[in-house]
Amino acid sequence: RELARFLGINFTTVTRAYKLCELKGLLQAVTGSGTFVASSAARSVTISTERPRSALIDLGFENPFQVFTDQIREITRDIAGRKQFPQLLDYASPTGMVHQKAAGVNWLKNIGVETDPDHLMLVSGTQNGLAMSLLALFDPGDRIGVDTYTYANFIELARLHHLQLVAIGSDEEGMRADLLERQHRLNALKGVFLMPSCCNPTTRMISERRKKALAQVIRREQLILLEDDIHAFFTAGTVADYAGPLARLVPEQSVYVSGTSKPLCAGLRVAYLVYPDRFREALLQALFNVNVKTSSLDGEIITELILTGTANAMVKKKQELAAERNRLFFRYFPELEGQGHPLSFYRWLPIPDTRGGAEVEQAFQQQGIRVYHSDRFLCGKREMQAYLR
């Protein structure tokens, strides 16, 4: 009303403008606080593999540690010499070949996922799996609950799909179930997006107790759970509290995505997407219409890594490398030790700087260093405390 009076225009015109800006991801309404310009309004916050200039020390992009490249080369050569090789080069089996899906089912058992080939598909990476799920299950204007700081590329996906993200507060155990329920009552959420094994960027893990509390709200309010579990292979067997993904508690309302870029190989674009019967038709239509079929060759290489036991060895080696990198970080920042995931591929560093995120990132780049500021990951009202990932 104040803006309408100031501009001398109709109140309903301003209301419509606010709504359009929210759909475009330019504004974020925070219940009880007001409407704020989104931190990502003036620029894309997408984090990609675009190479920085050679002299730049890249401490921002998440490095998944390339290991066992010689073994991958040999497996690829072996596959290329097989009689069935031509079958891996065509459009057949858009959800993955039967034996590839069976291997995926067994692989996911390592992290507490129980499914079968009829409820699993191979997709071309986690990001495409999430994009396909948003296209299939959500409509423009729908609201999705997310952590206050969440995966930057998901923020951009939501903007592309004209979806509104609603920030849900959290504590040391992860997103608070009571706040999720409250925001659903205020904003009529359709779904919730979570990374329970290791939230990107905060490194926070959702405890088993909190998973059960969140599952109760998701079940009771009939929300759709989108679970990105990219870090689960560094959580299972490492974190004592880990009993499996959140999706196992609400399987009929969940789309669960487990990518292989972090535990295995970033360049092989393969992720496993697990879904219930109720979402099958919509997800398959999205897969066929967008045509994001995973390369059968990539799927076969990942399958061979699993069947030969190389995949397990790769995970173990990466766990060792991640532990070594984290020890190095905590040597310089001992006050942060014990916070977040012990084997995270990134850390969340508080900084005493209240400048805007783009300005801080630019200041670091001028010193030859690339880092990512917390503004990239922010949904909702900006806090006084800022961070670097």
Residue ranges and their predicted role:
Residues 1-80, 89, 288-295, 317, ...:
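N-terminal basic, amphipathic alpha-helical segments
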Residues 28-29, 115, 371:
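Short beta-strand "wing" residues that participate in macromolecule-binding interfaces
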Residues 32, 116-117, 340-346:
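Short Gly/Ser/Thr- and Asp/Glu-enriched loop/turn motifs at secondary-structure junctions
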Residues 38, 276-277, 307, 350-352:
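Residue-level recognition of strand-loop junctions within catalytic nucleotide-signaling folds
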Residues 88-221, 226, 233-253:
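Conserved core of the PLP fold type I
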Residues 253-341:
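PLP-dependent aminotransferase class I/II
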Residues 275, 348-354, 371-389:
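Conserved PLP-binding active-site segment of the aspartate aminotransferase-like
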